[in-house]
Amino acid sequence: MPDRSEPVGHRTVTDASILAFGALTGDYAQMHFDLDFGPAQGMGGTIAHGLLSGAWSLGALAQHAPDRVGLGDPDAYIAGYRVKFGRMVYIGDLFSLRWADTNEPATEGLAPGSRVDTTFEVVNQRGEVTTSGAVSLTRGSLPNAPEPMEVEAWSKDGAPLPIHADDMVEYGPRGRSLGRTVSEADVVGWANFNGEPSPAYLNAEFANAGRFGARIAPPMWTFCLGFGDYLRDLLSVSMPSTGFAGHLGDEWRFLAPVFVGDTIHTRHRPVSFKRSASRPQMGIVEFAIQLVNQRGKVVQDGRVAMMMGARPE
């Protein structure tokens, strides 16, 4: 990472952090909440959500480099985000953030226009990079949103259980969530928890005069909410006992604002598989995610990469 900053924004992962993240996003995966699960699976302890450290990168930038995320700019919005998880994060780990300017967009498919692109690394108390990625800020137009993807009816009946990585695209879970109406508590709770005091989220007078005409929900929160919806479906099926579903990384695009009172549904499906070159007994599966509002408009889309047990070659 060229010309990176000194570490900023020190924050220790606590039980309360994990509980609050789960409550705000609906990600109640056993590995984060069962104190016996991680040690029994050889994880070395109870691990935090990957997206806890990923999301916190935006909070740290908001606190220590606010121009990188447009804090206080009525015309700017976070257009895209990418994250890669390199190491497990445990209760008691101490995060800090290093960031640098770049001229590469965080993800593909962003609308043309002037951007502020930032790469980041989240570093633990041992100097190890646990999380890395990029965020793109823009004052340009919104990209054209795709149509909501078709998600066929799915049932695990008839699927070859356990479902290996090789079988995910054909047999893996896909669907549409029950939906969630965005509340005042969601927006304020996330902004305060993650350290994102953007007036676009919290200040009605500022937001009413801004580009979207009202306060919006933090896009990092809406993506985490969609991830929680998808993950519940994924973890409802049997997968191989060799290895476990490891979260490798994500990316997302902001396509339209989400307001308090909007109802959003998550659509998701597996879209690709490739065998791991370094661990041939494992495969990498990509899942597509869309968040769709009550008017049928896709407001955010993204990809999730997971590593899972594959069939022997």
Language model regions located:
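Hot-dog-fold acyl-thioester-processing enzymes
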Residues: 1-78, 142-249, 313
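HotDog/MaoC-like acyl-thioester-processing domains
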Residues: 1-7, 85, 89-172, 254-313
